Amino acid sequence: MYAIVKAGGHQEKVEVGDVILVNRLDAKKGDTVEFPVSLVVDGDKVTLAAADLAKVSVKAEVVNDEAKGPKIDIQKYKNKTGVARRKGHRQKLTIVKITAIA
Protein backbone atom coordinates (compact mmCIF):
# COMPACT_ATOMS: atom_id res chain seq x y z
CA MET A 1 0.00 0.00 0.00
CA TYR A 2 1.26 3.46 -0.87
CA ALA A 3 -0.12 6.98 -0.98
CA ILE A 4 0.63 10.26 -2.70
CA VAL A 5 0.70 13.04 -0.09
CA LYS A 6 1.09 16.81 -0.23
CA ALA A 7 4.04 17.63 2.00
CA GLY A 8 5.83 20.97 2.22
CA GLY A 9 4.59 22.28 -1.13
CA HIS A 10 5.47 19.10 -3.04
CA GLN A 11 3.83 15.74 -3.68
CA GLU A 12 5.59 12.63 -2.39
CA LYS A 13 4.95 8.91 -2.92
CA VAL A 14 5.15 7.28 0.53
CA GLU A 15 4.78 3.88 2.16
CA VAL A 16 4.82 2.99 5.85
CA GLY A 17 8.41 3.16 7.12
CA ASP A 18 9.66 5.60 4.45
CA VAL A 19 11.87 8.50 5.53
CA ILE A 20 11.36 11.62 3.41
CA LEU A 21 12.71 15.17 3.26
CA VAL A 22 10.13 17.96 3.10
CA ASN A 23 10.38 21.74 3.26
CA ARG A 24 10.61 23.07 6.81
CA LEU A 25 7.53 22.25 8.89
CA ASP A 26 6.48 24.00 12.08
CA ALA A 27 7.07 20.92 14.25
CA LYS A 28 9.71 19.80 16.72
CA LYS A 29 11.65 16.53 16.84
CA GLY A 30 9.40 13.70 18.05
CA ASP A 31 6.14 15.45 17.08
CA THR A 32 3.52 13.68 14.96
CA VAL A 33 2.34 15.41 11.79
CA GLU A 34 -0.47 14.54 9.40
CA PHE A 35 -0.37 15.05 5.62
CA PRO A 36 -3.31 15.50 3.21
CA VAL A 37 -3.69 12.61 0.76
CA SER A 38 -4.11 12.92 -3.03
CA LEU A 39 -4.19 9.21 -3.97
CA VAL A 40 -4.12 5.82 -2.25
CA VAL A 41 -3.19 2.53 -3.95
CA ASP A 42 -3.83 -0.74 -2.09
CA GLY A 43 -3.01 -3.65 -4.38
CA ASP A 44 -5.41 -3.31 -7.33
CA LYS A 45 -7.68 -0.83 -5.53
CA VAL A 46 -7.02 2.83 -6.41
CA THR A 47 -8.76 5.55 -4.39
CA LEU A 48 -9.14 8.97 -6.02
CA ALA A 49 -12.53 10.28 -4.86
CA ALA A 50 -12.35 13.25 -2.51
CA ALA A 51 -15.03 11.79 -0.22
CA ASP A 52 -13.03 8.57 0.21
CA LEU A 53 -9.71 10.39 0.62
CA ALA A 54 -11.16 12.54 3.42
CA LYS A 55 -11.35 9.36 5.53
CA VAL A 56 -7.68 8.47 4.88
CA SER A 57 -4.82 10.05 6.80
CA VAL A 58 -1.06 9.67 6.59
CA LYS A 59 0.74 10.18 9.89
CA ALA A 60 4.46 10.77 10.25
CA GLU A 61 6.93 11.39 13.05
CA VAL A 62 9.49 14.20 12.83
CA VAL A 63 12.97 12.65 12.93
CA ASN A 64 15.02 15.84 12.48
CA ASP A 65 13.70 19.41 12.34
CA GLU A 66 17.03 21.14 11.63
CA ALA A 67 18.21 19.52 8.38
CA LYS A 68 19.54 21.53 5.44
CA GLY A 69 19.59 20.80 1.73
CA PRO A 70 22.62 21.00 -0.56
CA LYS A 71 24.42 24.31 -1.04
CA ILE A 72 23.41 26.20 -4.18
CA ASP A 73 25.81 28.84 -5.52
CA ILE A 74 24.44 31.88 -7.32
CA GLN A 75 26.81 34.05 -9.35
CA LYS A 76 26.02 37.30 -11.11
CA TYR A 77 28.54 39.04 -13.37
CA LYS A 78 28.46 42.17 -15.54
CA ASN A 79 31.15 42.39 -18.17
CA LYS A 80 33.52 45.41 -18.31
CA THR A 81 32.02 47.14 -15.26
CA GLY A 82 33.68 45.38 -12.35
CA VAL A 83 30.33 44.25 -11.01
CA ALA A 84 30.34 40.72 -9.65
CA ARG A 85 28.26 39.11 -6.94
CA ARG A 86 28.37 35.69 -5.38
CA LYS A 87 25.71 34.31 -3.09
CA GLY A 88 24.76 30.94 -1.63
CA HIS A 89 21.58 29.29 -0.39
CA ARG A 90 20.71 26.17 1.61
CA GLN A 91 17.05 25.19 1.90
CA LYS A 92 15.88 24.35 5.42
CA LEU A 93 14.29 20.89 5.54
CA THR A 94 12.48 18.58 7.94
CA ILE A 95 13.07 14.82 7.92
CA VAL A 96 9.96 12.75 8.67
CA LYS A 97 9.30 9.01 8.95
CA ILE A 98 5.91 7.72 7.78
CA THR A 99 4.30 5.74 10.61
CA ALA A 100 0.77 4.99 9.37
CA ILE A 101 -1.53 5.11 6.36
CA ALA A 102 -5.06 4.63 7.62
Swiss-Prot record:
GO terms for cellular component: cytoplasm; ribonucleoprotein complex; ribosome. InterPro entries: bL21-like (IPR028909), bL21-like_sf (IPR036164), Ribosomal_bL21 (IPR001787), Ribosomal_bL21_CS (IPR018258). It comes from the Bacteria. GO terms for molecular function: rRNA binding; structural constituent of ribosome. GO terms for biological process: translation. Keywords: Ribonucleoprotein, Ribosomal protein, RNA-binding, rRNA-binding. PANTHER family: 50S RIBOSOMAL PROTEIN L21, LARGE RIBOSOMAL SUBUNIT PROTEIN BL21M. This protein binds to 23S rRNA in the presence of protein L20. Part of the 50S ribosomal subunit. Contacts protein L20. Belongs to the bacterial ribosomal protein bL21 family. This is Large ribosomal subunit protein bL21. The gene is rplU.
